[in-house]
Amino acid sequence: MKRRRGFVMGLIVMLAVWPAGLMAQQRYRVAACDWMMLKRQKIGEFKLAREIGADGVEMDMGPLGQRVLFDNKLRDVSFQQLFRQTADSVGVKVPSMAMSGFFAQNFLKRDNYRDLIDDCLQSMDVMGARVAFLPLGGSGHEWKEKGAARTELVHRLHEVGEMARLAGKVIAIRTQLDAKGDKKLLKEIKSDGIKIYYNLQDAVDNGRDPAKELKKLGRKRVAQIHASLTDSVTLDEDPRIDMYRVKKTLDDMNWSGWLVIERSRNAKDVRNVKGNYSRNVAYLKKIFQENK
């Protein structure tokens, strides 16, 4: 409770109104991941997001490793003010906070998983984010089949899902399952606070049709979309996906929300952050914002 009061007091000091009319009426908005742009919880991420033409940035919670909590600057009131005011000043939103530490750490083996989720939810309060990204990549594969691991995962996700729901937020999980598997898992979890963070890369890498999969999942199960593929070429040159077809599917589903760029970097020039991400942002905006 003391920590939460500290967060609230920080918010009272620095909470600002987003610029009027900014991105008004946009059905689809485009963001990029700060950790993939080498700007994890760095103040320069907002200026960079503006420079590449993005509407927002998905902020990471910071490294986890063997730490008890994320190495998260947003627990510090001074950083709360600095990050929020800087984002406001350049007109960049933070639609989501990512717990990328769980790409390597096992969610099932963290006894303090509730504390980690609470840390994320409080950081979301600071930045005005609604979606928390929880990848299950570090949790192995045992949970994908019936058994003790799945039972425990379902229990934990229901619990943290209810934490998110009561806070007016959503935890979006990346599972690498197909649409049928995702629907089954969500049905078992039984919490409106848990949805799917759909990843185009997972679908393409596993030979699945993203358009068909999205349609099977349905609008209400998809919280947000990582709209990029495995590093090879930028999206505008990648023959592995028909992004116009993806848009038509989302239009037909009446889905709206954030498309977040994680990868799709030129494999021969992966560290050219501005070049890769500005090109991908421009391509997604051309299709999803200009192509009415």
PLM region spans:
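Bacterial N-terminal signal peptides
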Residues: 9-19
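Active-site acidic/histidine proton-transfer and metal-coordination neighborhood
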Residues: 19, 46, 50, 86-90, ...
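Conserved beta-strand positions in the central sheet of alpha/beta enzyme cores
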Residues: 58, 96-98, 133, 172, ...
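Charged helix-capping and loop-helix junction motifs
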Residues: 73-80, 111-118, 146-157, 209-215, ...
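Histidine-acidic metal/acid-base catalytic patches
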Residues: 2-3, 25-30, 38-55, 179-292
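Active-site-proximal loop/turn and secondary-structure-junction residues that shape catalytic pockets
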Residues: 36, 61-63, 100-103, 136-140, ...
